[in-house]
Amino acid sequence: MLIGFIGLGKLGMPCAEAVVDKGYHVNGYDILPRQSTKVDIKSSIQEVVEQSDIIFVATPTPHEEGYDGRDPTSHLPPKDFNYDSVKEVLTECNKYVRQEQVLALVSTVLPGTIRRELAPLVTNTKLIYNCLLYTSDAADDTPCVDLGGRRI
């Protein structure tokens, strides 16, 4: 099985390299120049999609100061994340993806956004969300319960 990662920042690169450490070949792409001794860095989204079975999308979703999840925000006016990069990547992936492949979105997305804004951009294959990826020591120390959900 060939794995792809689009977005090799603070979440994408550590996760991609961890997948390599488990014995898988990983293709990766980022809009910024990246280097890795483990991940096979590609020059385009198209290359990653065409050479991978599962493609993880780990692009940033910037947010306003104070909405990073560290402090409660229920007393503040609701603010959404900026999904422009996610939308661009999903739209580009959809041009090249095949029905038997899977797109897995791991970027931070608020509830309802997948169904309302992002899933409609992926028409040629399955889009899954909320797959758990951890960086650093969190993977070793975090208990995990995985529950099923509704298909989108």
Model-inferred region functions:
Residues 145-152:
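Hydrophobic alpha-helical segments, chiefly the membrane-spanning helices
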Residues 56:
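N-terminal Rossmann-like NAD(P) cofactor-binding module of classical short-chain dehydrogenase/reductase
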